[in-house]
From Swiss-Prot:
Region (Interaction with TGFB1I1): 801-1009
UniProt note on tissues of expression: Most abundant in the brain, with highest levels in amygdala and hippocampus. Low levels in kidney (at protein level). Also expressed in spleen and lymphocytes.
Record PTM Phosphotyrosine, positions in chain: Y402, Y579, Y580, Y722, Y819, Y834, Y849, Y881
Region feature (Disordered): 701-725
Identification of the protein by name: Protein-tyrosine kinase 2-beta
Location of Phosphoserine modifications: S361, S375, S399, S762, S839, S866
Record PTM Phosphothreonine, positions in chain: T765, T842
Length: 1009
């Protein structure tokens, strides 16, 4: 390939034609450029070709090459089609394949800037450059008719988005229409009745595939014959359409379901207060949508925009400011991330170039430090007398030399006014006494004449100026807060005596409410309270505010289903630093994190610690944390690694979440946004459990007494084994899934050799078929004895009956002998050998037995975990033992079903394991008071270990879901199985610890003979 004669930056973006001759245009690379600065970008685009090699183009460029030069190079190459008239509609998208992270690249960006800003965030091979049509003319359907290449490219792009995002959501009728339109367009030369022939339709199914045209879900829901007939009938409606007509019909049909010519962003408009809206950006301008049923409201047209600016905020958020002609102030839009703001800025700037008269960019980039020093903000022009009055008011009482110059830019005249008249508030009874003064119940009459029940915090008259400022600091913070689970501030009276008026909640403090109603409150409600407070803390986290006093005494109950966080007396903003260092003041030591106790350092991470302690209070029905310790001893306990014990009713998953919040390293604690998601999952799980229990109680079926289930005799030791062909396994040769031998030894019916192969010979399991096990000889017709009379027939029937009774007696006797042999061998054999015995339960032939001379030799096990057999005790009414059995069954079910389940189905089997573990720990907690105190430490430690095992299993499950479509899928599944096996082993260890404690307490009994 050779370069064009002049740089592509000089080529006008008008009608682009492919140059004459075989040469293909490329970005010009100067001769003196070093090799390190030269790059080859692989840019993908859409086409009709099934050949992946024709759907991308390699572009050679340098780090100084601009994105618009790369776009122009592809359009000039003719790879997507000839005679492109609407080159301004195209843009370049950078997409991360694993996380779906998207960055729209501005035409003026250079390759080096893209590399430094975006590509360095992930591995280079995980990024993909896509050529997309992003900016559409106002009447795009008519405009695209003049540019056939752009029309077909936009159709391919839109159809690709439809198959990936909308195909499974539209109705069957619409999916059928859109699929037949593509079928007609794709096979434009096919006769209208071609699909009526069965051979043609089968050729379409086998050679091309219906997945290219119709969603897979639709094909699975319909019968093949019915689906074929529907396609034939619908295709007849579009058989006479030409290619362009099919495209236009596709646009019009899909437009009834999705917006094909605009992009929608969920963001907040900053207009004195924040309004959450859907911002719609398309050819008609920038519009806002407050609800799905409402009509969009126009905020600005692209011709009115004069500047675009992106400003980063804390916690990854950003503000997009649009300077609009004739508007007194910029339109400010708050987004969840800087990348989203930049994508919106590129979209708006592209439409301004397309519809405006200028070709330049309206985006104003942040200035460098040197530029900032050369430009100072304008001095505010205030009235001289006003400035003098401010200076006189701000003078210090003790000095006439220093004065504070007020910052006029911080004044917000448009904000809500919280000053109210004292005569509008009537005080009633005293609710309690705080650090600064009494708290009263009262009634406030607003300007509309409405009476509102309020709580009034008062400040003592003899309070010092410093304490008064601390008292008022709570109101200063609360007036900026607006959240459904944060106490609402009504107003402030700053004159002496100072009052802070807040909403009154009739149920009072959460701590007292929990104590009064602990017999009626359910775990589901307690988890709901924790979730609501977590949402409030996530809101405080988003505005860089630390609370520093999260406890049930500072939470008010608005209703039995709603709580609100209050008491912001210790709250502080952390704007300049990421932490707040407290001065000498009274602090809640038993709720605080180690770094807060040691260094008076308060961050969002320390609030996470306190929130977990508050959750512990809620699940303990208002008990004070570390009530058995004095304040001075708390830090020593925390430094040793001890934490608050699990409350009795606390779900294991929730306690695991608490322990994560109590990590000594603040950086390892989860953020509140993550905790909201985790608590939502726990709440949904508890809700499902409650609904299931209610359903079982409502529709409980009567118990039916059934006879004891017949169990087949266990395999005898002398039966020979065979070696069939190897059996494939999800675990692969690298990972062997082991069932604890002790569990199998103490419960032979837990797992049968036929169903769960052991790791020793799981690759050599004999195929066991029911028709082979219970095989009997057939008889010819002449073998039957023909009775000559009715009496003879009766005698033959009696003889057959006696014979069958003898056979049954013999089998029953053998079964008793086999059972006695099994109980004897359990004591001498290694339990794993019994579990791994793969001999069939009943051989095909009862001959050829080898003489039994002793127990079979234990096969070698490399790297297996040594597990002692479980104690041989009486397991009647032993709930711990039964729950351990259930847990192992749940783990085995996970192991067997993991390879068949889709990624979203992993949650079901893991949830089953979690629920079973919860029952196990609950049964241990019920038994714990009757066990010796010397054994409780080991049992509680094993319980904590099981909670950590479950958390690890959940983490591995999420990892497996994230990598379901990558090459790491099998490895993640193996890690998930390893975590589940560890959980089963630790459950067996818990059973052993409980058995030992029961023996010490004389609660264990040998099994009855």
């Amino acid at each position: 390939m050779s370069g064009v004669s002049e740089p592509l930056s000089r080529v006008k973006l008008g009608t682009l034609r492919r140059p004459e001759g075989p040469a293909e245009p490329m970005v010009v690379v100067p001769v003196d450029v070093e090799k390190e600065d030269v790059r080859i970008l692989k840019v993908c685009f859409y086409s009709n070709s099934f050949n992946p090699g024709k759907n991308f183009k390699l572009v050679k460029c340098t780090v100084q090459t601009e994105i618009r030069e790369i776009i122009t190079s592809i359009l000039l190459s003719g790879r997507i089609g000839p005679n492109i008239r609407l080159a301004e509609c195209y843009g370049l998208r950078l997409k991360h394949m694993k996380s779906d992270e998207i960055h729209w690249l501005h035409p003026q960006m250079t390759v080096g800037e893209v590399q430094d800003k975006y590509e360095c965030l992930h591995v280079e091979a995980e990024w993909r450059y896509d050529l997309q049509i992003r900016y559409l003319p106002e009447d795009f359907m008519e405009s695209l008719k003049e540019d056939r290449t752009t029309l077909l490219y936009f159709y391919q792009q839109l159809r690709n988005d439809y198959m990936q995002r909308y195909a499974s959501k539209v109705s069957e009728g619409m999916a059928l229409q859109l699929g037949c339109l593509e079928l007609r367009r794709f096979f434009k030369d096919m006769p209208h009745n071609a699909l009526d022939k069965k051979s043609n339709f089968e050729l379409l199914e086998k050679e091309v595939g219906l997945d290219l045209f119709f969603p897979k879900q639709m094909q699975e829901n319909l019968k093949p014959k019915q689906f074929r007939k529907m396609i034939q009938q619908t295709f007849q409606q579009y058989a006479s359409l030409r290619e362009e007509e099919c495209v236009m019909k596709f646009f019009n049909t899909l437009a009834g379901f999705a917006n094909i010519d605009q992009e929608t962003y969920r963001c907040e408009l900053i207009q004195g207060w924040n309004i959450t809206v859907d911002l719609v950006i398309g050819p008609k301008g920038i519009r806002q949508l407050t609800s799905q049923d409402a009509k969009p409201t126009c905020l600005a047209e692209f011709k009115q925009i004069r500047s675009i600016r992106c400003l980063p905020l804390e916690e990854g958020q950003a503000v997009l400011q649009l300077g609009i002609e004739g508007a007194p102030q910029a339109l400010s839009i708050k987004t969840s991330s800087l990348a989203e703001a930049e994508n919106m800025a590129d979209l708006i700037d592209g439409y301004c170039r397309l519809q405006g008269e200028h070709q330049g960019s309206l985006i104003i980039h942040p200035r460098k430090d040197g530029e900032k020093r050369n430009s100072l903000p304008q001095i505010p022009m205030l009235n001289l007398e006003a400035r003098r009055s401010h200076l006189s008011e701000s003078c210090s009482i003790e000095s006439d030399i220093y004065a504070e110059i007020p910052d006029e830019t911080l004044r917000r005249p448009g904000g809500p006014q919280y000053g109210i008249a004292r005569e509008d508030v009537v005080l009633n009874r005293i609710l309690g006494e705080g650090f600064f003064g009494e708290v009263y119940e009262g009634v406030y009459t607003n300007h509309k004449g409405e009476k509102i029940n309020v709580a009034v915090k008062t400040c003592k008259k003899d309070c010092t100026l410093d304490n008064k400022e601390k008292f008022m600091s709570e109101a200063v913070i609360m007036k900026n807060l607006d959240h459904p689970h944060i106490v609402k501030l009504i107003g402030i009276i700053e004159e002496e005596p100072t009052w802070i008026i807040m909403e009154l909640y009739p149920y009072g403090e959460l701590g007292h409410y929990l104590e009064r109603n602990k017999n009626s409150l359910k775990v589901l409600t307690l988890v709901l309270y924790s979730l609501q407070i977590c949402k409030a803390m996530a809101y405080l986290e988003s505005i860089n505010c630390v609370h520093r006093d999260i406890a049930v005494r500072n939470i008010l109950v608005a209703s039995p289903e709603c709580v609100k966080l209050g008491d912001f007396g210790l709250s502080r903003y952390i704007e300049d630093e990421d932490y707040y260092k407290a001065s000498v003041t009274r602090l809640p030591i038993k709720w605080m994190s180690p770094e807060s106790i040691n260094f008076r350092r308060f961050t969002t991470a320390s609030d996470v610690w306190m929130f977990a302690v508050c959750m512990w209070e809620i699940l303990s029905f208002g008990k004070q944390p570390f009530f058995w310790l004095e304040n001075k001893d708390v830090i020593g306990v925390l430094e040793k690694g001890d934490r608050l014990p699990k409350p009795d009713l606390c779900p294991p998953v929730l306690y695991t979440l608490m322990t994560r919040c109590w990590d000594y390293d603040p950086s390892d604690r989860p953020r509140f946004t993550e905790l909201v998601c985790s608590l939502s999952d726990v709440y949904q799980m508890e809700k499902d459990i409650a609904m299931e229990q209610e359903r079982n109680a409502r529709y409980r079926t009567p118990k039916i007494l059934e006879p004891t289930a017949f169990q087949e005799p266990p395999p005898k030791p002398s039966r020979p084994k065979y070696r069939p062909p190897p059996q494939t396994n999800l675990l692969a040769p690298k990972l062997q899934f082991q069932v604890p031998e002790g569990l199998c030894a103490s419960s032979p019916t837990l797992t049968s050799p036929m169903e769960y192969p052991s790791p020793v010979n799981s690759l050599h399991t004999p195929p066991l078929h029911r028709h082979n096990v219970f095989k009997r000889h057939s008889m010819r017709e002449e073998d039957f004895i023909q009775p000559s009379s009715r009496e003879e027939a009766q005698q033959l029937w009696e003889a057959e009956k006696v014979k069958m009774r003898q056979i049954l007696d013999k089998q029953q006797k053998q079964m008793v002998e086999d059972y006695q042999w099994l109980r004897q061998e359990e004591k001498s054999l290694d339990p794993m050998v019994y579990m791994n015995d793969k001999s069939p339960l009943t051989p095909e032939k009862e001959v050829g037995y080898l003489e039994f001379t002793g127990p079979p030799q234990k096969p070698p096990r490399l790297g297996a975990q040594s597990i002692q057999p479980t104690a041989n005790l009486d397991r009647t009414d032993d709930l711990v033992y039964l729950n351990v059995m259930e847990l192992v069954r749940a783990v085995l079910e996970l192991k067997n079903e993991l390879c068949q389940l889709p990624p979203e189905g992993y949650v079901v089997v893991v949830k089953n394991v979690g629920l079973t573990l919860r029952k196990l720990i609950g049964s241990v907690d019920d038994l714990l008071p009757s066990l010796p105190s010397s054994s409780r430490t080991e049992i509680e430690g094993t319980q904590k270990l099981l909670n950590k095992d479950l958390a690890e299993l959940i983490n591995k499950m999420r990892l497996a879901q994230q990598n379901a479509v990558t090459s790491l899928s099998e490895e993640c599944k193996r890690q998930m199985l390893t975590a589940s096996h560890t959980l089963a082993v630790d459950a067996k260890n818990l059973l052993d610890a409980v058995d030992q404690a029961k023996v010490l307490a004389n609660l264990a009994h040998p099994p009855a003979e």
